[in-house]
Each structure stands twice: as structure tokens, then as C-alpha cells.
């Protein structure tokens, strides 16, 4: 409450039962945190069109205002690609060679929630992760 008062805002905490994700794969690369993020994108897409997602450990050293200049067309998100060595290591670690060159920092995502919602992306991703589709 004190933090909310200090910044003249409100803080809403949502409690989500992790059993909702019990049938999804988890590993050091796919955690419940990843699934909560996807679910939050779906929920927020009902009321806002874009969202800047930042992990709690991200330090912003400058203004984020330039991000507001990004105009989405058909893109789901704007992401920051990892450097080449991290790209290669991530692809190898995940045993997905085709990820090399496509690996990005999932802790900083500017999401086009309007497109996310229109494409019904959350149910699609959860179905894919559950192995219910090819």
C-alpha cells in the first residue's frame, strides 16, 4: 500500500492456481513463470492494446519513451535478440538448432496485445505446449 500511495497508483495482485499449468512441461527453460506471463498477456489484451513486459531484474538506464514510437503492423511483439554467442548457446542448450539466430531475451518484450488477442495466441500456445497439435 505504501508503494502504491508513493507513486499514486494501485497495485492488484492476482493469485493463479499453478494446477492450471500442471499438464504443461516444466524445465529450467520452461517454468511456470513463462506460463503466467502468457496468461497475463491474454488477460490484459481485453483492456489494453500494447504492453511493455519487463522481468523484475531488468534495470532501465534511460527513458522508455522511444518504445512508444514503435508502430505494430502484424507483429506480435518487439523483442531484443541476444548476442551471437548467447544465440548459439541457447539453441544448443534447447537442442533446437533452428533457434540459432532467433533466440531473444524473454525478460524484455513489447507486446502487441491487440494482435495477440485477435490471433487467439494464448490457447494456441497452450495447445501446442501440451502436445495436442502438430
Language model feature labels by segment:
Residues 1-134:
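Glycosyltransferase catalytic domains, chiefly GT-A lineage
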